Amino acid sequence: MTAAPSPRCDRITELTTDQLRARLPEALQIYVTAMGYPPTTAQQRAPMWSAHMLRAGWRCIGAFSDHNELIGIGYGYLGAPGQWWHEQVRRGLLASGGDSGGWLDDYFELTELHVYPGSQGAGLGEEILRRLLAEAPGSKVLLSTPEGPTRAWRLYRRVGFADVLRNYRFTGDPRPFAVLGRPLPLEPADSAPAESSGRNYRARNTDG
């Protein structure tokens, strides 16, 4: 039996809140497939993703196949006191003696970044990341990603993300996470081929 060809990217574009709402089932399907989560996770995450669209500075980038299927998604917004992720990171930085005021001021939170597994391996994750951050508000960007030698780590290091907090455990998740950050804007991409996208491109897995 011949395998179906992998979807190829035809266009990458910014999405409005209305456009993402219309594509939310597709976006969440990419999320659970790329992360290997149970299908029921999509339904649980839908209200959270919808709430994030209302936050200041929210912007979203989508990648589409030549059949107009969503195959990649990335979004984020301005971090602020009172947000669950902000308070978790602040607590971790204070406990570790880190500079919470320096990082947690005027920053863009890279919340989600995912590529459909069949479309990984051609640098699509990096392209979405760069498009998302090209006009992101804030003087810096922060994200969290599970600890471990993943493609996500190679991507983030390649574009200049540095350690902010390591081996941190967010409330409700036993896995160790790293919080990474860097100033904005990004430098232009060099001429080296982009590494493949990976299932752990996801910036983090829990927020309120």
Regions found by a protein language model. Name each.
Residues 57-62, 73, 107, 112, ...:
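Short hydrophobic/aromatic beta-strand element in the GNAT-like acyltransferase core
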